[in-house]
Amino acid sequence: MYFLVADHREHHVIPFLKTDLQHIYQNPTQKKQIPLEIKQLFTGDYLICKSPSTILACIERKTYKDFAASLKDGRYKNRQKMLSLREQTKCQLYFFVEGPAFPNPQKKINHVAYASIITAMTHLMVRDHIFVIQTKNEAHSSQKLVQLFYAFSKEMVCVVPTSLTPTDEELCIKLWSSLSGISGVIGKILANTCSVAHLVSGQLPPQNIDQLKTPSNRPFPKKVKRMLISISKGNKELEIKLLSGVPNIGKKLAAEILKDHALLFFLNQPVECLANIQIAQKTRTIKLGMKRAEAIHYFLNWCGSARVTVDSQNITETSRPATIQATATQPAATQPLHEISNEALNEASNDASNEVTHTGHQTLFI
């Protein structure tokens, strides 16, 4: 059985996709239904799959504006994750580039000449052997997706089945990216520079925040800097957004947890105290539970260079929650907090420029 998986953030295309597939369902000559699943994807925006977990194709969709922005801030190098996925699964890779056909080569799109975008697209095809398909708009992208899906469903494509799970780093990047304005690249730098506990406890001074740069050596956007400083001063709304990025913790649960106390209060408490927090539901009250409490403590103290505890002036390794032991471990180091923020900054910027390549731990969807 073949099925199409769409990333839940593709909300501009999904309505068209549902309509196009609905026409197929109503076609009397089409006996088999085409399932569409909307999930969280860590590589690409769409996956064409064959049951149970065979990936046939990975598709990334970008508008001209998105493509231009990715050239400037380093997200263009996300293609490395797609290349790694292809190496592991032998799937085909596609880039959908959305916008009016053949604009003037000198036309500026997001301050990038269209000629530069064409050059980047050519490199994707020639150097990386990635198919590039140009579409007019979201509706046209949906039509091309359905056509591509049918082309695969009519042919047997031999690939290696794979079961992919996210690494701790990817989950931590997702946590930081729950804040508005923080892209995957900026999230990666933050995940490898400091922990959330480090930030909310005020141990990342404003001057260190001001030094943060993207892989292209550009300063972080002012909005992001102001937001990080605001978190260090105890902004409740932003703390709720951060907490909601922890696996199995949504916005409603995060708001309930932080209803009476700041995030720093819970990070200073033993895990057992956090596990006993009473969560009000419609008809009853339940405890947060040890598994969620351990996940909160683990990911809010997670840093690519080390894990930080807010009740100490040294960085110490924290215990790994039993529920996450299946994922890859990260190295820990013992050094003063003021050193980690400077040294890890350079490491993280260099690392982000090369992007994550071990898709052996990426996820198909969760």
Swiss-Prot record:
InterPro entries to which the protein is assigned, alphabetical: ERCC4_domain, Mus81, Restrct_endonuc-II-like
Q: Which residues form the ERCC4 domain?
A: 3-101
| Protein known as | ERCC4 domain-containing protein EP364R
Induction conditions: Expressed in the late phase of the viral replicative cycle.
- Lineage, opening ranks: Viruses, Varidnaviria, Bamfordvirae, Nucleocytoviricota, Pokkesviricetes
| Family, similarity comment | Belongs to the asfivirus EP364R family.
Gene3D superfamilies cross-referenced by the UniProt entry: 3.40.50.10130
Top-level division of the source organism's lineage: Viruses
Q: Listed GO cellular component terms?
A: Holliday junction resolvase complex
Query: EC annotation?
Result: 3.1.4.-
